[in-house]
Amino acid sequence: MEQEIETESTSTALSQDQVLQAALKLFSQKGYFNTSLTDIKDAVGLKTTSGVYQFFKTKQAIAQTLRENILDSLSISIDDVRRRNRKASEQLREIVDLLFKLTDDAPEIVQFLLFIKTDDFLPEATPLLDTPAFNKIRRIIQNGIKEGEIRAIDPLMAYCYFFGIINQTLALVLQGALAKSADSYQSQAWLTAWGCIAKK
């Protein structure tokens, strides 16, 4: 009897993560509104949707947890990047490396984070640019301007120029319009994006 209880609690701990992983994949492939709890249940291999309700009351709660988890992980990664590198150019280069690596290794994460309009189904969520992770990126740009590494322009415009190129490249890779892996375009995208904001 004790062994049965242990097995059930172990599978419960795994199941919440499995629900999140399945939902992430489905949201990224089909979109939030085209994904039902039944789709998530089927992807996880549960018999009924009550297995999903055991962890999350709504599909919106799943999406919110996913977004928070992804943004928390990104924020921690950015902290690591900032500790390892002093210059804004080095920090931005490592963030670009991370985004391109994620696009190749975990495309669902990049799709969900950058290209799915989460404000359509999470209206109360903090706007992406106001989250801790993206505030840190904006601070990197501000510091780069202050240190004279980045042109003296509005920091938000510098963000737009730089990440407009990076994000559009990633979007085209995810859509299949750019046929090779993201890694194949990383160097060229970096040089172009950095060239837009670097102080000459």
Which residues does each predicted region cover?
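Generic hydrophobic, amphipathic alpha-helix propensity
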Residues: S15-L24, I40, L66-I70, L74, ...
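Hydrophobic alpha-helical connector segments
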Residues: T65, D79-D105, Y159-F162
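Hydrophobic/aromatic-rich alpha-helical bundle segments in the mid-to-C-terminal region
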Residues: E108-I116, P123, I145-T192, K200
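A short, glycine- and basic residue-enriched loop/turn
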Residues: Q16, K59-Q60, V110
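Short coil/turn segments at alpha/beta junctions that flank glycine-rich nucleotide-binding fingerprints
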Residues: Q29-F33, R84-N85, A106, E147
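Helix-turn-helix
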Residues: L26, F33-A61, T65
